[in-house]
Swiss-Prot record:
Molecular function as annotated in GO: cysteine-type endopeptidase inhibitor activity
Disulfide bonds: 91-107, 120-140
GO terms under cellular component: extracellular exosome
Signal sequence coordinates: 1-26
Keyword terms of this UniProt record: Disulfide bond, Protease inhibitor, Secreted, Signal, Thiol protease inhibitor
Principal location: secreted
Remarks, miscellaneous: Negative results: the recombinant protein does not inhibit calpain-1 (CAPN1), a C2 family cysteine protease and legumain (LGMN), a C13 family cysteine protease. Does not provoke cell death (PC3 prostrate cancer cells).
Family under the similarity heading: Belongs to the cystatin family.
Lineage: Eukaryota, Metazoa, Chordata, Craniata, Vertebrata
Site annotation Reactive site: residues: 29
SUPFAM superfamilies: Cystatin/monellin (SSF54403)
Name of the featured protein: Cystatin
InterPro entries assigned: Cystatin_dom, Cystatin_sf, Prot_inh_cystat_CS
Keyword Transcription regulation among UniProt keywords: no
Length: 141
């Protein structure tokens, strides 16, 4: 007796294709790597830099040098996990009108011997439908 293999071939191919997917796509809520040039990552990084400067007791602004690594997680919205390098600028903070991200990025750096670089990890929670971003975690050294 000969049995047809056709009905089994389709589901078998589908199973093989699913097994070859990256593991992050198979875990709901898992971390996924993101390109540091992704517009959503850039927006989260800008927000993180502004929040860092608002919360920091330092008398000078720090600007973004580069995003070292970016990951995201689907939660109620998106959570971005960013590793970034920040550098102390020559721009002093003044009371009244804090600088926005683009202004901070235009600040000059001090001479090489006086430069202070920070390695920071930020978690930014984005909920676009509420037009809200929140810095949920920050650590720099």
């Amino acid at each position: 007796m000969v049995h047809s293999q056709l009905p089994v071939a389709g589901p078998l191919r589908l199973l093989c294709a699913l097994l070859l997917l990256p593991s992050a796509t198979m875990i709901p809520g898992g971390l996924s790597p993101r390109s540091v040039t992704d517009p959503d990552v850039q927006e989260a990084a800008e927000f993180a830099v502004q929040e860092y400067n608002a919360l920091s007791a330092n008398a000078y602004y720090y600007k973004q040098l580069r995003i070292v690594e970016a990951q995201s997680q689907v939660v109620s919205g998106a959570k971005y996990y960013l590793t970034m390098e920040l550098m102390k600028t020559k721009c002093a903070k003044t009371t009244g009108k804090p600088k926005v991200y683009k202004e901070i990025q235009n600040c000059e750096l001090p001479p090489k011997a006086q430069q202070e670089k920070l390695n920071c990890r930020f978690q930014v929670w984005s909920r676009p439908w509420l037009e809200k971003m929140e810095l949920t975690k920050m650590s720099c050294n």
